[in-house]
Amino acid sequence: MMTQAKVGLGLRREMLDEFCQSVPGAIDFFEVAPENWMTLGGKFGRQFRQLTEKHKFFCHGLSLSIGGPEPLDTRFVKQIKTFLDHHDIEIYSEHLSYCSGKGHLYDLMPIPFTDEAVRHVARRIEQVQDILERPFILENVSFYASPASEMSECEFVSAVLEEADCRLLLDVNNIYVNSINHQYDAEAFLRAMPSERIAYLHIAGHYDEAEDLKVDTHGSEVIDPVWRLLAICYQTHGVFPTLLERDFNIPATHELLKEINKIHGYQTKALQPSHRSA
């Protein structure tokens, strides 16, 4: 099993003043959406540069549309590369979804779970990796309308990773949300993911629209069933860098640190000999 006991936090602009003064030791890395920072100048731009010079950063994109029907926006990918190079960021991930098709859709749409889609996405990933000169990492996404399917979501994710020879950002909350919304076994999905492909993890809170409908909002605390899945993930696949996502209803840093330290606790427990041999 791979051991990378690190915990990160999604960086928001409203956090810049505080973290430019001091970053808590429990935060090992930050994650940002490059689209929100690439053209940032002035005070925010200077503060962001100050942080990237001193701290580890990952990037998690929003608008690449890796599964989209239109030609890949190679100009945009080159802009991403320039941003990554400038800030010395090696990790770049995106959603296994699409957000364009005769215009921008302003949402992340699920890709049909078909062999044709697997090949289509893999070809586009090869283009991206060639331009970025970095490994490309894909995230399993939450979705609410079931796409056309020749295989399960689990089989589709695994097939894309294998065909494209790329790595996985495993979002534990998305597994839980989808398991409720689409009625499958979250633990079985988690255990079926290929350990050797995992690069890092996401964990977050969600919104309970109804008993059988969960919405991935990143706007609340992580709930117990998701914490349990995280523990199972570490026991099954090993400990990986894990990012706490909190995009809305953001509490004070000391409240975020409670969840960050909880992740550290799960990592420490999973690394104990009795758990590694389980």
Curated annotation (Swiss-Prot):
Q: What is the lineage of its organism?
A: Bacteria, Pseudomonadati, Pseudomonadota, Gammaproteobacteria, Alteromonadales
Record family assignment: Belongs to the UPF0276 family.
Provide an example Pfam family for this protein. MbnB_TglH_ChrH
Q: What is the protein's given name? A: UPF0276 protein Shew_2240
Q: What is the protein's species of origin? A: Shewanella loihica (strain ATCC BAA-1088 / PV-4)
